[in-house]
Regions:
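Extracytoplasmic gate region of multi-pass secondary transporters
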Residues: 19-20, 211-264
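Extracellular/periplasmic helix-loop-helix junction of adjacent transmembrane segments
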Residues: 20-51, 250
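Helix-breaking motifs and short loop linkers at transmembrane-helix boundaries and internal kinks
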Residues: 31, 62, 83-89, 117, ...
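Central cavity-lining transmembrane alpha-helices of secondary-active solute carriers
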Residues: 42-56, 257-269
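Conserved MFS/SLC helix-loop-helix module at the cytosolic interface between two early adjacent transmembrane helices
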Residues: 50-85, 274-277
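Cytoplasmic helix-loop-helix junction between adjacent transmembrane helices
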Residues: 92-130
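Glycine-rich segments within core transmembrane alpha-helices of 12-TM secondary carriers
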Residues: 121-148, 345-356
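A late C-terminal transmembrane helix in Major Facilitator Superfamily
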Residues: 335-367
């Protein structure tokens, strides 16, 4: 199962990397200003938010069908992205591609969390995330020769089509998770698909006023804090480095590959720290480190200093992403796990990812450039660290069923921070 699911992070790594690297080329093709780039990135991320609907379906039809079909739709819209002839079609097709890619990743995380032993869940999510390095390296290596050829940035999207079709074929052998199979057996025939889907949607938002309200709001706020590092790094680094700091395509490609190679050890460290010292300390430390690193990245001018800050930013972001994804998948019961995950990660937790690129694009003119605009939003992860320290429960080593049963309303509508379990 792990092998069949890790392909999602490989393609996510590749997709994020080529969007990351090709931004200057795309901006040149469509004659875009910083504000245009920010608006494009925000609309593309709107697709990620709409993945909430796709992941919600996994609580009704199962985990396996969703991860099997999302890869096909992602392949289709990746192809359409490569064939787009204007900014509107490019943005629209990329937004739809992100809808299915983000949905696929969300369900894959749920499946790993449900199938791995309790004491290894953190490492399981870390393994899923760290395989994205393969896609990052591929994107970085292809960028120079492909984007510089007559194929341009479109060639970067064409490259991923054949592997995606192969993955779609192999996914036919994927099995359903044991927890979901048992859940469906218990509730077989109780409601129709349409009524069940309506119930899932109602239940998702009903959770905002129910026993899991605090957990939903907390996890959503944490993802928003994480995205204040991830969104500007992905959207603007390449443009900032090439246009404002006069880096070459080769230098940018090499920097991204190096950053993600070293950053992969962030997933390894996160998996170890999550299961050894706990969720709270790991999450807090990664948030603070990410805030400091991205501020340095966009406030330094020297090549060595920028490269070092880029590596530190990616490393911290990978630790933070793994830590937050682990919380997202642990804090809700099986019957609403996928729905709650998608509500917190893909919908409510993506508000800053949606707004930050547009905000930075607008602020860049007022604050004297991209560097100052990014620095203005870098405080976000520090706020996230404070929220974790004050309100997040310690979930290390606890069975999912125990965590679901322990939910109770307190200040902030969530459980008080629990003491770390042995």
């Amino acid at each position: 199962m792990v092998g069949l699911l890790t392909s999602v992070t490989i393609f996510e790594g590749y997709d994020v990397t080529i969007f990351h690297l090709c931004t200057p080329d795309i901006a040149r093709t469509f004659h875009m200003s910083d504000l245009d780039v920010g608006a494009m990135a925000s609309i593309v991320r709107l697709g990620e938010m709409m993945a909430f609907v796709v992941v919600m379906l996994a609580d009704r039809v199962g985990r396996k069908p969703i991860v099997s079909y999302t890869v096909l739709f992602y392949t289709l819209f990746t192809l359409m992205t490569a064939l787009s002839h204007g900014l509107r079609t490019f943005t629209g097709f990329q937004s739809l591609a992100q809808l299915f890619l983000s949905g696929e990743f969300g369900v894959a995380t749920i499946m790993i969390s449900e199938e791995f032993p309790d004491r290894w869940r953190g490492r399981g999510v870390a393994i899923l995330n760290m395989t994205g390095l393969i896609g990052v390296i591929a994107g970085g290596l292809f960028y120079g020769p492909v984007a510089g050829s007559r194929w341009g940035w479109r060639g970067m999207y064409f490259i991923g089509i054949a592997p995606l079709l192969l993955v779609a074929l192999l996914r036919r052998n994927l099995r359903e998770t044991v927890r979901f199979t048992e859940l469906k057996r218990k509730h077989r025939g109780e409601t129709s698909f349409v009524n069940g889907l309506r119930e899932s949607a109602a239940q998702a938002f009903r959770g905002l006023s129910g026993p899991y309200r605090g957990r939903l709001l907390l996890v959503a706020m944490l993802w928003n804090c994480v995205m204040l590092v991830g969104a500007p790094a992905v959207t603007f680094f390449s443009l900032y480095a090439i246009r404002d700091r006069l880096w070459t395509r080769s230098q940018v490609g090499s920097a991204v590959v190096l950053a993600y190679i070293i950053g992969t050890f962030g997933h390894v460290l996160a998996g170890y720290m999550l299961d050894r010292v706990g969720r709270k300390l790991t999450t807090c430390a990664s948030y603070v480190a990410g805030a400091a690193a991205i501020m340095l990245l966009f406030q330094t001018a020297g090549h060595t200093e920028m490269l070092t800050a880029m590596v530190a930013t990616v490393f911290a972001f990978q630790v933070a992403r793994t830590a937050t994804a682990t919380y997202s998948a642990e804090l809700f019961p099986t019957e609403i796990r996928a729905t709650s995950y998608s509500l917190t990660v893909q919908l409510l937790g993506r508000i800053t990812a949606l707004l930050t690129p547009l905000t930075i694009g607008a602020l860049s003119r007022w604050l004297g450039g991209l560097g100052n605009a990014v620095a203005a939003v870098s405080i976000g992860p520090v706020i996230g660290a404070v929220l974790v320290a004050l309100f997040a429960p310690e979930t290390r080593g606890k069975p999912l069923e125990e965590l679901a049963a322990s939910s109770r309303e307190t200040t902030f509508g969530s459980e008080k921070a629990a003491a770390p379990s042995g």
